[in-house]
Amino acid sequence: MNPARRSGRIGKAVSDMDKKLGALTAAAAVAGAGAAVVLAKKGGGGKKAAEKSGPETCAPASYRNTELGKHEKNRKGIYYTNGNYEAFARPEKPEGVENKSAYIVGSGLAALAAACFLVRDGQMPGDHIHILEAMDVAGGACDGIFDPSRGYVMRGGREMEDHFECLWDLFRSIPSLEKPGASVLDEFYWLNKHDPNYSLCRATVDRGRDARTDGKFNLSQKGCMEIMKLFMTPDEDLYDKTIEDVFDDEVFSSTFWLYWRTMFAFENWHSALEMKLYFQRFIHHIAGLPDFSALKFTRYNQYESLILPMQKYLEEAGVDFRFGTEVTNVIFDIRDGRKTATAIECRVNGAEQGIVLTENDLVFVTNGSCTEGTIYGDQDHAPNGDAEVRTSGCWSLWKNIARQDPAFGRPEKFCSDISKTNWESATITTLDDKILPYITNICKRDPRTGKVVTG
């Protein structure tokens, strides 16, 4: 049972790699930096920025509509481009990067990706990058590992698709562990070309009988309008609203809702804002909802296919992995509209320790997690529903950070009512062939082929 599900009323998803974290607020991935920059200055564009480089100094007021103006950075310090002209160019080495260090809290997919980009694009020396992980193994929620006492345990997995631009950009640079000379992206691409994902039985009724949804959405005109209205509603108008506040039975009784909630694990009482963000993120794959054909998967579980190659890449670059290190707080100096991380408080194998930060230190934190505070059950024991999980791991860390400034979000929105935020998953390790005919009968595929089974 996982207590970190989304009843949250506020939030913005910020990464194509883990959109499941609707719990990420504007403070998500709290990126601190010693006395360096943490938050972008507002209104930093304008006249001052125009004085910095030659061509922009004398540009006309309307230059934003020309090729000259399209690369001006916005207030977040980024600009948007198109085509692949910039996609494959290697960045210049940042000035002074050899004098900087990075502290990354956790070792899940987002944390390891941050470290990989620091090595590849940031060209930071590997031994200047420190990954602080409370557990004794990397991977975070990508933890499909065989446990001799429980069998295979896998709390979650990423549902990947064509437009995971950051993920694919990263894994084109991570060497495959099995195919010499190939990248993880190469082997992933070849696999999904030869064995594309789709389901032959999207839903069942009566203990395994095909529900025969026939790919239809069964949405009324009113239901379609409710979805369109949500899609167009400003984010701020959806704070503190649930999906039940914006949809009625016209949507909830449709096959579309069956497809949607089973693909993305939504409940009726979850955040309306997160629902909207998912619509915006995956609207281009609406045709793949009825049979999962929009999705792509790795050959093995994602710990072995994604995490281990990243970990080896980082270890070979000299990155410092510190297991058994639980970060409990990041201390900020808040003044003049800036938030600067000055220290990290952590518990190393049970002993309290601290890390003092300088202006050359960067800190990366992912706050909130769908799998934090996991309570395990087994063949003979149900998960202990009375266990206190709201103070575990990253929830406690986020609360300690949030106490320092309201801008860091409201974690209690996502972990205060466990009955509405928990979610359950189950993995079954078979000991013989007795169950296989039942799987074959439902999925219309032999699970022993090594190819797609359920879709």
Give the location of each predicted region.
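Rossmann-like flavin
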Residues: 176-281, 296
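N-terminal Rossmann-fold NAD(P) dinucleotide-binding loop
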Residues: 111
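Glycine-rich loop(s) and the adjacent beta-strand/alpha-helix scaffold that form part
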Residues: 347-449
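Extreme N-terminal leader/targeting segments of oxidoreductases
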Residues: 3-14, 21-102, 120-126
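Glycine-rich FAD pyrophosphate-binding loop
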Residues: 119-146
